[in-house]
């Protein structure tokens, strides 16, 4: 980990993503959906942007925050758990915040949780005083223990955290949990959630004030158009003027109805709905006067 350093001038935006692992493929798919394409180098660590001056650097996920802090990369797609861990570690040694989460991306969800042996009777954070807690996220854990006023020993491990209590090297663990199957296999029970994590787009606290700043703004806008619309549906139908208010009451969770003129005295209406529309809901709209109902998926949009 290093303090923020001045990086050589660049006119191309550079994004760091995981070379391999659970975030790698979704990250590349998301950026491709934003209209980016690349030419890969022979070592497959650097991808030169062809559609736009936006290049990819393929690295380990725990290197991404440092690359942003040092100005080597402008943006990165990384788990919030990794970003928050390194940010907490920087603060604990007196370094300023050098990066921030700009957008949640809706994939790679997991939780950073305390897990105790199944025979424990969990009574709350005060119970942890004097215990040994194994974790790969020591900075987040130390910060949380300090907030709780609990004095416990943090045992830092780089992997296989869940086996530490069985080996006698720790009393409990603080680790990432997705399905919980690994905890159950090691006779551990989750008892407290420290962090809800997902993949995020991270960037420097201060955006570049050159051409890269404009590229960053454009990419953020495109990301919003892809991510925010992923689960939304465009609903289109016809209705007479006297049925519009009643139909709007059935769509209170949707965006305001857009009215478009149509032949025969009817209106063409459309709205964006937050999620799938069931057959039951469509039939309810039909009974209220909607005709020619159509539900369309939205691949991307610009607000």
From Swiss-Prot:
Stated regulation of activity: Feedback inhibited by histidine.
Its job: Catalyzes the condensation of ATP and 5-phosphoribose 1-diphosphate to form N'-(5'-phosphoribosyl)-ATP (PR-ATP). Has a crucial role in the pathway because the rate of histidine biosynthesis seems to be controlled primarily by regulation of HisG enzymatic activity.
Which keywords has UniProt assigned to this entry?
Amino-acid biosynthesis, ATP-binding, Cytoplasm, Glycosyltransferase, Histidine biosynthesis, Magnesium, Metal-binding, Nucleotide-binding, Transferase
Q: Which family does it belong to?
A: Belongs to the ATP phosphoribosyltransferase family. Long subfamily.
Q: What reaction is this protein's catalytic activity? A: 1-(5-phospho-beta-D-ribosyl)-ATP + diphosphate = 5-phospho-alpha-D-ribose 1-diphosphate + ATP
Q: Which Gene3D superfamilies match?
A: 3.30.70.120, Periplasmic binding protein-like II (3.40.190.10)
A Gene Ontology annotation in the biological process aspect, one of them, is: L-histidine biosynthetic process
A GO molecular function held by the record? magnesium ion binding
Annotated InterPro entries: ATP-PRT_HisG_long, ATP_PRibTrfase_cat, ATP_PRibTrfase_CS, ATP_PRibTrfase_HisG, HisG_C, N-reg_PII/ATP_PRibTrfase_C
According to UniProt, this protein's pathway is: Amino-acid biosynthesis; L-histidine biosynthesis; L-histidine from 5-phospho-alpha-D-ribose 1-diphosphate: step 1/9
The family database entries (HAMAP family) matched by this protein are listed as: HisG_Long
List localization entries.
Cytoplasm
Please name one Pfam family that this protein belongs to: HisG
Which top EC class applies here? Answer: transferase
Q: Which GO terms describe its cellular component?
A: cytoplasm
Record protein name field: ATP phosphoribosyltransferase
Q: Which cofactor does it need?
A: Mg(2+)
Source organism per UniProt: Stenotrophomonas maltophilia (strain R551-3)
Q: Provide the E.C. number(s) assigned to this enzyme.
A: 2.4.2.17
Predominant location category: cytoplasm
């Amino acid at each position: 980990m290093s303090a923020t350093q001045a990086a050589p001038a660049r006119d191309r935006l550079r994004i760091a993503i995981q070379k391999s692992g659970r975030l790698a493929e979704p990250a590349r798919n998301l950026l491709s959906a934003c209209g980016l394409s690349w030419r890969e180098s022979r070592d497959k660590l650097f991808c030169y942007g062809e559609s736009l001056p936006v290049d990819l650097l393929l690295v380990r996920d725990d290197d991404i925050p440092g690359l942003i802090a040092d100005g080597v990369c402008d943006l990165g797609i990384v788990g919030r758990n990794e970003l928050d861990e390194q940010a907490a570690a920087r603060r604990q040694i007196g370094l300023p915040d050098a990066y921030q989460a700009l957008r949640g991306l809706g994939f790679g969800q997991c939780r950073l949780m305390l897990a105790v042996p199944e025979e424990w009777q969990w009574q709350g954070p005060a119970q942890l005083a004097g215990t040994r807690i194994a974790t790969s996220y020591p900075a987040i854990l130390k910060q949380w223990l300090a907030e709780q006023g609990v004095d416990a020993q943090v045992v830092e491990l780089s992997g296989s955290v869940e086996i530490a209590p069985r080996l006698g090297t720790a009393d409990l663990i603080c680790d990432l949990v997705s399905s919980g199957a690994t905890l159950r296999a090691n006779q551990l029970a989750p008892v407290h959630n420290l962090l809800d994590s997902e993949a995020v787009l991270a960037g420097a606290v201060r955006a570049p004030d050159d051409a890269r700043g404009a590229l960053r703004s454009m990419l953020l806008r495109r990301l919003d158009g892809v991510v925010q619309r992923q689960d939304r549906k465009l609903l289109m139908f016809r209705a007479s003027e006297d049925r519009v208010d009643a139909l709007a009451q059935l769509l209170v969770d949707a965006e305001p109805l857009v009215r478009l003129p149509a032949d025969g005295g009817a209106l063409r209406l459309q709205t964006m709905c937050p999620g799938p529309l069931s057959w039951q809901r469509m039939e309810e709209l039909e009974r209220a006067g909607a005709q020619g109902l159509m539900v369309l998926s939205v691949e991307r949009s610009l607000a």
